[in-house]
Amino acid sequence: MGKGCKVVVCGMASVGKTAILEQLLYGSHTVGAETSDTQEDIYVASVETDRGVREQLRLYDTRGLREGLDLPKHFFSVADGFVLVYSVDCLESFKKVEVLKKEIDRSRDKKEVMVMVLGNKCELRERRQVDQDTAQQWARGEKVKLWEVTVTDRSTLIEPFTSLTSRLTQPQSKSAFPLPGRKSKGTPSNDI
């Protein structure tokens, strides 16, 4: 198991961030159960990657964002990845995800941080406010992976987190240091 990755889970209040994590990790979330506001929690998960290796994931469950309340700035510097969550039955929550993605891009280099988006409550078809095609088009433009999920079906939660963990823990393919006997780009050659 590697060093572990820090992943910040964020989005508006009541989109189901805590429900997603509790259902994913414990299979214990009851839809409709009364919940209290999350202040901030950390969950530790051991996730099997698509390479068959178990990796540790530290999931930072953040307080739901409301009008005038932003994601605390320290999360931008400590996170290896972000999971942005919206509810398909709340257009405002999707717009907040768009804003969060811009904030992440402003504070971090796109190549150094992994972002994925979850559209939660996809079973609420009759109350849908966020069009799936529109959301996917936005995600493609932002170069992020988007999944629609529901806590009523735990299997919809497993693939996104397995994929995220696999991408965060990919072995480096190239050494940052040149190997003896090989020419590296930008190094003058003595060949004539």
Curated annotation (Swiss-Prot):
It is found in: Cytoplasm. InterPro entries: KBRS, P-loop_NTPase, Small_GTP-bd, Small_GTPase. Keywords: Cytoplasm, GTP-binding, Nucleotide-binding. GO terms for biological process: negative regulation of canonical NF-kappaB signal transduction; Ral protein signal transduction. GO terms for cellular component: cytoplasm. Residues 1-192 are annotated as: Small GTPase-like. It comes from the Eukaryota. Gene3D superfamilies: P-loop containing nucleotide triphosphate hydrolases (3.40.50.300). GTP binds at residues 11-18, 61-65, 120-123. One of its GO terms (molecular function) is GTP binding. PROSITE patterns: RAB (PS51419). Atypical Ras-like protein that acts as a potent regulator of NF-kappa-B activity by preventing the degradation of NF-kappa-B inhibitor beta (NFKBIB) by most signals, explaining why NFKBIB is more resistant to degradation. NCBIfam families: small_GTP (TIGR00231). In contrast to other members of the Ras family, the members of the KappaB-Ras subfamily do not contain the conserved Gly and Gln residues in positions 13 and 65, which are replaced by Ala and Leu residues, respectively, and are therefore similar to the constitutively active forms of oncogenic forms of Ras. This suggests that members of this family are clearly different from other small GTPases proteins. This is NF-kappa-B inhibitor-interacting Ras-like protein 1. It comes from Danio rerio (Zebrafish).
